[in-house]
Regions:
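Negatively charged, low-complexity tracts enriched in Asp/Glu with abundant Ser/Thr
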Residues: 2-38
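Mixed-charge, Lys/Arg-enriched low-complexity segments
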Residues: 63-99
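Amphipathic, interaction-prone secondary-structure segments
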Residues: 26-56
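Histidine (H) residue identity feature
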Residues: 16, 37, 41, 60-63, ...
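Short, flexible beta-strand-to-coil junctions
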Residues: 11-12, 34, 51-55, 61-67
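Terminal, low-complexity, charged helical segments
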Residues: 3-5, 49, 57-59
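Short, surface-exposed coil-to-beta transition loops
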Residues: 17-18, 42-47, 72
């Protein structure tokens, strides 16, 4: 099901000037993987994998800080297709069961 995707990049907290940029697109989430416990905002890195309406792959990476949500840091990576995304994020895509 296609819906609006909005991902952000930068640091969240007041001392880090909020988020530096964001990306909005139409698409669907095709995978998720985390190496920690991001739901509790205490540690780890989470990856959301999206496919846009145009077929592009967006990987949204969020590193959750150990102590405060003000230090959470996000980044997004946009690729033309799944093969291109796999060159940089092969392990993430495997663990998210996308490839």
């Amino acid at each position: 099901m296609m819906k609006k995707i909005r991902v952000w990049e930068g640091r969240k907290g007041w001392k880090h000037n909020k988020y530096t940029k964001s990306l909005t697109s139409t698409g669907e989430q095709i995978g998720f993987w985390s190496d920690g416990h991001p739901a509790f905002h205490n540690r780890g890195t989470a990856f959301w994998v999206y496919r846009t309406k145009k077929g592009e792959i967006i990987i949204h990476k969020v590193h959750w800080s150990k102590w405060t949500t003000e230090d959470d840091e996000g980044a997004f990576f946009k690729f033309a297709n799944l093969d291109e995304a796999a060159t940089k994020f092969h392990r993430v895509l495997q663990n998210a069961r996308v490839i």
